[in-house]
Amino acid sequence: MDQSIQVNINEVNQALERKDSLDVIKWAYKTYGDKLVYACSMGAEGMVLIDLISKVRPDAPVIFLDTDFHFSETYELIERVKERYPKLQLKLVKPELTPEEQAETYGDRLWERQPDLCCKLRKLVPLEKELAQYDAWMSGLRRDQSPTRTNTQFVNEDRRFGSTKICPLIHWTSEEIWMYIELHQLPYNDLHDKQYPSIGCEYCTRPVKEGEDERAGRWSNTSKTECGLHQ
């Protein structure tokens, strides 16, 4: 059985402190190689990170958690990403239960009654099974996205999944993300042009009002702020 790759997270973060995102990505693939996967939500940050990754590892494995509840615009974006990056190993990871099976087992509109359970069934459990094949995973988290993400480092211990989480974009602002997208003419979700800065499942995402933070449109009628992937 292969041994997992271990790193001293504090030492690595000190070494990477003054490095840029591309340096972090290069370090990640040099360290983990094929044992590293990018879990992409197909948000604006995801488009930037895919583009940066393609410069280092064009055939990198990338997974998207297909909950079956995403906007049609999100699925359309996935096809455009495949066209732009044909070497990318993009895999859609599905839950065990279809929406119909989930409704039969747990009742209709579970996302309204028990959003944490819905996220667990359709996101957390599938991701946990997928990450078991890898030693580390990459994420497009940024510190200024929300108060829950302000302490994110380049390299993080991920107790939730027993893994290492690498976040190359922690210092980027929303403005810098969009400058990069426009400069390189990257594909992006059309909903971003309709006041959706953060896009998740269709049932749990609304447009954001002026003055709200980027993730205010996620689970807006509940106290929930994260799906559980980054806690």
From Swiss-Prot:
Gene Ontology CC terms, in alphabetical order: cytoplasm
Active-site residues per Swiss-Prot or TrEMBL entry: 227
Protein's pathway: Sulfur metabolism; hydrogen sulfide biosynthesis; sulfite from sulfate
GO biological process: cysteine biosynthetic process; hydrogen sulfide biosynthetic process; sulfate assimilation, phosphoadenylyl sulfate reduction by phosphoadenylyl-sulfate reductase (thioredoxin)
Protein role: Catalyzes the formation of sulfite from adenosine 5'-phosphosulfate (APS) using thioredoxin as an electron donor.
InterPro entries in UniProt: APS_reductase, PAPS/APS_Rdtase, PAPS_reduct_dom, Rossmann-like_a/b/a_fold
Gene3D superfamilies in UniProt: HUPs
Keyword Membrane listed: no
EC annotation from Swiss-Prot or TrEMBL: 1.8.4.10
Cofactor(s) the record lists: [4Fe-4S] cluster
Family assignment from sequence similarity: Belongs to the PAPS reductase family. CysH subfamily.
Binding site for [4Fe-4S] cluster: 118-119, 201, 204
Catalytic activity: [thioredoxin]-disulfide + sulfite + AMP + 2 H(+) = adenosine 5'-phosphosulfate + [thioredoxin]-dithiol
Leading EC class: oxidoreductase
Domain of life: Bacteria
Protein's cellular compartments: Cytoplasm
Cofactor details (free text): Binds 1 [4Fe-4S] cluster per subunit.
One GO MF term attached to the UniProt entry: phosphoadenylyl-sulfate reductase (thioredoxin) activity
Chief localisation class: cytoplasm
Record keyword Cytoplasm present: yes
SUPFAM superfamilies named among the record's database cross-references: Adenine nucleotide alpha hydrolases-like
Keywords: Cytoplasm, Iron, Iron-sulfur, Metal-binding, Oxidoreductase
Listed name of the protein: Adenosine 5'-phosphosulfate reductase
